[in-house]
C-alpha cells in the first residue's frame, strides 16, 4: 500500500489542521501560511480541501474518487455524503473508538484481523459499517496488553455521538450515520465536489 511519508506535523500545518485530528498528541506552534504565501486561487482552495481529507483518512486518489462517486448517488448533499463515506470506514471507526492511536495504526490492527463486525471477522480497513452494526474485538485480542496500553493513551479521546461505545468491553454500535457536524476538523467538502464536477 502506498504511504505518504511527508512529516506529519508539516502536513498538518500546511493543511491547517491540528495534529490531534490524526491522533498525534503534539501541536505545531507555527500557524499555517505563517510565511506569507500568496493568495490561493479557487482551484488551489479546492485542491487543498481534497488533500486535507485524503491525508486525514489516509486514502489515495483512486479510492477517494470512488467515494465521491458514491456520495453523488446518495440522497442529500454530495459533500456531506463524502464525509459519511469516509467516517464509516472500519479503520476510522476503530480510531474513533480509541482502539488505535492513529488511523494508520487502526488500518494495521484491522488488517491483522483483531476486530469483528456483527460477530464476523473483517480484515478490510475500507469496509463500510452501517447503522446497527456492532464492532467488537476478538476474544483472543481482548486480553492483549497492547490494546490496554492503547486505551490508556487514547483515554481522553471523545467518542462521536453516532457511536455507542463501551471501552471496558471493547465494543461499539453504530447508532446513526455520521455527517459533517460530527467531525473534529474544519472542512469545506462542497469545494471538493466543485473540483470533481469540472
Which residues fall in each region the model found?
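Ferredoxin-like alpha/beta domains used as RNA- or RNAP-binding modules
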Residues: 1-97, 124-198
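Short, well-ordered loop/turn sites that connect or cap secondary structure elements
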Residues: 109-110, 129
